[in-house]
UniProtKB/Swiss-Prot annotation:
Keywords: Cytoplasm, Nucleus. One of its GO terms (biological process) is nuclear pore complex assembly. The keyword ATP-binding does not apply. InterPro entries: ELYS_dom. The gene is ely5. GO terms for cellular component: cytosol; nuclear pore; nucleus. It holds the Pfam family ELYS. It comes from Schizosaccharomyces pombe (strain 972 / ATCC 24843). This is Uncharacterized protein ely5.
Amino acid sequence: MLKMEDDQFERFVGLFSMKDEDFPYNSQVTNEIQTFRKQQVDSQLFFDVLLSFIEGIEDPSSLYPPKSIDDLQSLFMIIENSNIDELKQQCFYYYLLKDWEKSETYSEQVSLPKNYQHLMDGYYYLDRLKFEEAINHLLLPDVLPNFPDKIIETLYSNEKYKFLIRFVSFVGPPLDTFRKEECYALSLVRYSFLASYHYMKKCTKPLVLWEEMIQLILESNDTQSCKLIVSLPLSQEECEVLFSLLRSKKEPLYLNTLLALLVESNNIQEALELSSNSTHLQKSAVNTYLHKLNSLSS
């Protein structure tokens, strides 16, 4: 451990405590933090990523959570002697002091700007997979999250699709990779197929997203979106992908949508052949309409 000067020791004691009974990182808390770390998409806490900006830190996970007061002093000295500015140091201490339930008092003592408090609160709650609390802090005015890629991936991998949509809509991070486009489109499609479809058309790999969107709504048995698909002015490539997927299974929603699509595209003969070979389709409303349509054209 680096040797502390007297003024540094006073600051340390003023921030934390030298009493063992005050030390919050017991085995239960330590295990919880390590579990949260393993559940992160890249096995890194947001605090790990922040610590990695300090020159010389190669393994942030070995520093947090500290296993003893000596370890905490070592982390304190690394931050104190680091190449980062005072405001960033205060942000690190604010995050650590949340574990000690002293962060609010500290922020008042050093006049830590509110937007930085909310930013660190957001990261703290993301690290603990408390997504609603995290988003409520990260979407406040003047808060500028600086790890949008990790935030998007974290929300998507934890199936927090509404929060992801809110984050993208409010913060407006550049969706400049296919993975980010994919996370957003496949979140959006769960709530608005039409909005997701229009977004998909502007993406770098629209047909790949189109196939993923169709698979998702079919697998989730989203009948309303399937009805909407049939009425869309699809391109030839989109139609080919759609027909291929619909013909891949004999499940009811696949068959219903395929029959409706064949009727809509005026492929009456193929629609009649499909319905005649399916007991399920013979009972459908689309089949009744199909036979009326066929009798009128005969």
